[in-house]
UniProtKB/Swiss-Prot annotation:
InterPro entries: Chaperone_TCP-1, Chaperonin_TCP-1_CS, Cpn60/GroEL/TCP-1, GroEL-like_apical_dom_sf, GROEL-like_equatorial_sf, TCP-1-like_intermed_sf, TCP-1_chaperonin, thermosome_alpha. Molecular chaperone; binds unfolded polypeptides in vitro, and has a weak ATPase activity. Transmembrane segments: none annotated. This is Thermosome subunit beta. It comes from Aeropyrum pernix (strain ATCC 700893 / DSM 11879 / JCM 9820 / NBRC 100138 / K1).
């Protein structure tokens, strides 16, 4: 129940008002159920997008811009969520996206199912603390099961890595080009992967995705270097430079205006001419300084004015201006250049190296390609597509594919998809629960039912009877050798998903279960919600009082 004020009565019977007027408070079972309802509502929205046969959502923002996607992270990001419990779910789901790169929908749907099962236990008067403890115990056991059945994968298992990427891409808008995109994703990740001790490390920041609509998805290609969505600044500059020695600048090549206001008294045309000549000399000296280091390519984060462009062109130097800071840093990492903030400090050893810097036409636009860099651990995927929204969705899909391949290489453990892991985990949890004392047993069983809801959602979204599929799954997993049996979403039959090549990183599964259990436990521990009056309402009331 929601009330405006909650008086507290001392033993002598004097009411004490502790909350500011206008503050709303809900507490007890009603507060808990309201929070559960909010999380389940978000989960229900994402549930129909789950799996390769899931539907898409059309999201329209306040400006009327339309996004069509089934990417869980994007849907949550675009939704204007108001309820505090729902906001918690969104925040934890974003953490899943940051940590594993995929599995956002699994996290949200599983959290919703955990709270749905918890609500049933609350109805039979099981305390929230017991439910939370039971869920923690079930999560510990589930994690053990997943880690014990996971199979090894290595940097050299290229075919398995491609299957992992294809599994991620199956549910995306780019599914028709999944084979091609899977190859690109694996090649890109393997290129930037670094061996550190006995483990592999992948920094996805070394993989740049540049979007350019036009052409088809299959026109997308991998560039072993950096691509700048810029063009060479002057028509007389070279368009192709081999054995490029690159100067990276964080300073403008133009006459800067003084920070204080100055007035110059000019009495003759000769003085104007002298002023312009002085400015030219300053710029010419800067260009001479750059050329003296041996640089034949200049890339700056700031501007290059017309006079500086002219002098650079005369020296045969290719120049690009107003490049994003993030791109400048990528070029620095790739070429070994040092970013210079003052041309007076520029030295030959500050220059980066690349085999080729070239301006090329891509669709209707020109772009600058930097290839054969000193450090090959930087690559660019030039993403093409027939229209802008398709390219945007392809970028989101490709990001997920890159993430799961990186997870697999770094962790070296993978599992089968199609609900196989969930069915195996649920089977073990039911057996484990029967050995537990007291009400904890009921909470562990509830966790198992929530896990089983995931393959049921896959089946439902593919048009199959979820109950029938669940019964078949349970029957198949009675045999230990059938641990990788899951749902064939085309036929509804239970098949060996490992032999079908439906593979996922262990990290995605583990992190999704952990994140969902964490948010469900947080929600179940809340028994009081105190909402301060909104600032806008207070201002409105003050204005109304002043008018009176």
């Amino acid at each position: 129940m929601a009330i405006q004020q909650q008086p507290m009565t001392e033993p002598v019977g004097i009411p004490v008002i502790i909350l500011k007027e206008g503050t709303q408070r809900s507490y007890g079972r009603e507060a808990l159920r309201a929070n559960i309802m909010a999380v389940r509502a978000i989960a229900q929205i994402l549930k129909t997008t789950y799996g390769p046969k899931g539907m898409d959502k059309m999201l329209v923002d306040s400006l009327g811009d339309i996004t069509i996607t089934n990417n869980g992270a994007t849907i949550l990001d675009k939704m204007d969520v108001a309820h505090p419990a729902a906001k918690m779910l969104v925040q934890i789901s974003k953490g899943q996206e940051d940590e594993a790169g995929d599995g956002t929908k699994t996290t949200v749907i599983f959290a919703g199912e955990l709270l749905k099962e918890a609500e049933k236990l609350l109805d039979i008067n099981i305390h929230p603390t017991i439910i939370v403890e039971g869920y923690k115990e079930a999560l510990r056991k589930a994690s053990e099961v997943i880690e014990s059945i996971a199979e090894p994968v290595s940097y050299d298992d290229v075919e398995k890595l491609k299957l992992i990427a294809k599994t991620s891409l199956n549910s995306k808008a780019v599914a028709e080009a999944r084979d091609y995109f899977a190859e690109l994703a694996v090649e890109a990740v393997r290129t930037v992967a670094e061996r550190r001790g006995d483990r592999w490390y992948v920094d996805l920041n070394n993989i740049q995705i540049v979007k350019k609509h036009g052409g088809s998805l299959r026109d997308t290609r991998l560039v072993r270097g950096i691509v700048l969505d810029k063009e060479v600044v002057h028509p007389d500059m070279p368009r192709r430079v081999e054995n490029a020695r690159i100067a990276l600048l964080d300073t403008p090549l133009e006459i800067e205006k003084p920070e204080i206001d100055l007035e110059i008294s000019i009495t003759s045309p000769e003085q104007i001419k002298a002023l312009y000549e002085k400015q030219e000399r300053i710029l010419q000296e800067k260009i001479e300084k750059i050329a003296a280091t041996g640089a034949n390519v200049v890339i700056t984060q700031k501007g290059i004015d017309d006079v500086a462009q002219h002098f650079l062109a005369k020296k045969g130097i290719l120049a690009v201006r107003r490049v994003k800071r993030s791109d400048i840093e990528k070029i620095a990492r790739a070429t070994g250049a040092r970013i210079v903030t003052d041309i007076e400090d520029l030295r030959p050893e500050d220059l980066g190296y690349a085999e080729l810097v070239e301006e090329r036409k891509v669709g209707e636009d020109k772009m600058v390609f930097i290839e054969g860099a000193k450090n090959p651990k930087s690559v660019t995927i030039l993403l093409r597509g027939g229209f802008e929204r398709l390219v945007d969705e392809a970028e989101r899909s490709l990001h997920d594919a890159l993430s799961v391949v990186a997870d697999a290489i770094m962790d070296g453990k993978i599992v089968a998809g199609g609900g196989a892991v969930e069915a195996e985990v649920a089977k073990v949890l039911y057996e484990y629960a029967s050995k537990l004392p007291g009400k904890t047993q009921l909470a562990v069983e509830a966790f198992a039912r929530a896990v089983e809801a995931l393959p049921q959602a896959l089946a439902h979204n593919a048009g199959h009877d979820p109950i029938e599929v669940l019964v078949k799954l349970r029957s198949a997993h009675e045999k230990p050798e059938n641990k990788w049996y899951g749902v064939d979403l085309d036929t509804g039959e239970i098949v060996d998903m490992w032999s079908r090549g439906v593979l996922e990183p262990m990290r995605v599964k583990l992190n999704a279960l952990k994140a969902a259990t964490e948010v469900a436990s947080l929600i179940l521990r809340i028994d009081d919600v105190i909402a301060a009056r909104k600032e806008e309402e207070e201002k409105e009331e003050k204005r109304g009082g002043e008018e009176e």
